[in-house]
Amino acid sequence: MAIETFQRGFVLHRKPYSETSLLVDLFTEETGRLTVLAKGARAKRSAWKGVLQPFTPLLLRWSGKGALKTLTKAEPAAIALPLQQTALFSGFYVNELLCRVIEAETPNGELFQDYLHCLTRLASEDGVEPALRTFEFQLLTMLGYGVDFTHCAGSGEPVDEAMTYRYREEKGFTASLIKDNATFYGRDLLAFEARDFRDPAVRSAAKRFTRMALKPYLGNKPLKSRELFAHNILFLK
C-alpha cells in the first residue's frame, strides 16, 4: 500500500543494508515511527545521497503492507538543523529515545511537534538541558505516565515546597524524611509540573527523575548515544 501524499518527517537512525541500500528508522507527523528500506541509497549516483540524514526536515513517501516499507520519495523540506557539539549528541539521544520507547506506526502529531520544537531549541542558544528535560516530560506524558507532581500520593495533601518527597514507581511522590537519590524537594516537583527548568538545581533534579521514570521503558540495555557522548566529551572541551 502506497501513501498518496508526502508526509513530513525526520530520519532517526540508519544502517547499511546489502551493498547499496539502507534501513532507515523514520519519525513522521502522521504515521509516527516506522522503518523503511531505501533501495540504492548508498549507490554513488543515488538521488538520496546526502538526503537521508538525521535532523533534516524531509518530505517522504513509501509503499508496502508489512512492517518493513519501501521508501519511494524523499526530499528536503528545509535545510538541516545546525546541531553542534553537545547539542548534536543530545539530538542523537532524543532520536534513540524515540526508537526505543514508542510503538511503530502509532500516530502522534503532538509528539512530532514536541520533537521538532526540541530540535529547534537544541539548534539555538536556548540551552541543551531545558530542551531535553521538556521533551522527556512530554514523552512520558505520551506514554501515559500520569504522576501527580502537585499532591502527596500518600496523604493527598498539596506538595509543600520545603518538604522532601520520595518517588515510587507507578505511585507518585510520598513525603519522606530520608534524603537520597530517589527523593526530591517539593519546590522541584512544582517546577516539574510547570515545566520550568530555568533553575540549574531543578534541571539536575529533573534529570534524575526522568532517568528513573524512563527506565521501565528502556530496560537494562544502555543507550548508545550516552556512550557516544562519554567517549567524545573530552574532544568537545
UniProtKB/Swiss-Prot annotation:
InterPro entries: ARFGAP/RecO (IPR037278), DNA_rep/recomb_RecO_N (IPR022572), NA-bd_OB-fold (IPR012340), RecO (IPR003717), RecO_C (IPR042242)
Annotated TM spans: none
This protein's UniProt keywords: DNA damage, DNA recombination, DNA repair
Keyword flag DNA repair: yes
GO cellular component, one term: bacterial nucleoid
UniProt keyword Oxidoreductase present: no
GO BP terms: DNA recombination; double-strand break repair
UniProt similarity note: Belongs to the RecO family.
Function in brief: Involved in DNA repair and RecF pathway recombination.
HAMAP family, per database record: RecO (MF_00201)
Protein name: DNA repair protein RecO
Phylogenetic placement of the source organism: Bacteria, Pseudomonadati, Pseudomonadota, Gammaproteobacteria, Pasteurellales
Gene: recO
